[in-house]
C-alpha cells in the first residue's frame, strides 16, 4: 500500500511537539519506511521547505526533505491528471486549501491513505493515518 505524506507530518517529524511525540514519530517513520511505498506530493515539498526553512534555514530544510527522498520516498509531480482531479475536488469544497486538494488527488490516484491529522482530508473522502 502507498502512503502519501502531508506537510503536517513532515513538520511534526522535524519539530516534534514533545519528547513522547518524538519517540512515537520515530517508531512510526521507521515502520512506514520499511513497509510502505511513501509518496511526497510536490506541493508538500514546497510547503515543507517554506515552513521548515523559516526555522532551520533553506539549506537544512532541503537537506531534511532529501533525507526522506534518499530513504525511498518518491516525489510526485503535479501532472495534468492530478491538477484536473484537484480542481474538481476543490470545486465541491471551497473551504479546503488548494494544497490539500492536490494532496488528496495524489492519494486518490494511488488509492492511498494520507499521513496527516488534518480533517480537511475527511471532508474530501480521503482516509488518513497518524503516528499516534
Show which residues each predicted segment covers.
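Residues that scaffold the ATP/ADP-binding catalytic core of kinase and kinase-like folds
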Residues: 12-14, 51, 86, 124
Amino acid at each position: 500500500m502507498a502512503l502519501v505524506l502531508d506537510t503536517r507530518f513532515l513538520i511534526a517529524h522535524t519539530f516534534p511537539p514533545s519528547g513522547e511525540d518524538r519517540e512515537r514519530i520515530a517508531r512510526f517513520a521507521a515502520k512506514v519506511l520499511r513497509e510502505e511505498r511513501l509518496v511526497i506530493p510536490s506541493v508538500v515539498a514546497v510547503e515543507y521547505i517554506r515552513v521548515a526553512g523559516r526555522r532551520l534555514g533553506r539549506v537544512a530544510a532541503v537537506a531534511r526533505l532529501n533525507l526522506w527522498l534518499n530513504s525511498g520516498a518518491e516525489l510526485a509531480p503535479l501532472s495534468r491528471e492530478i491538477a484536473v482531479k484537484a480542481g474538481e475536488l476543490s470545486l465541491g469544497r471551497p473551504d479546503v486549501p488548494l494544497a490539500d486538494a492536490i494532496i488528496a488527488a495524489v492519494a486518490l490516484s494511488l488509492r492511498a491513505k494520507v499521513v496527516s491529522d488534518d480533517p480537511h482530508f475527511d471532508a474530501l473522502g480521503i482516509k488518513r493515518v497518524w503516528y499516534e
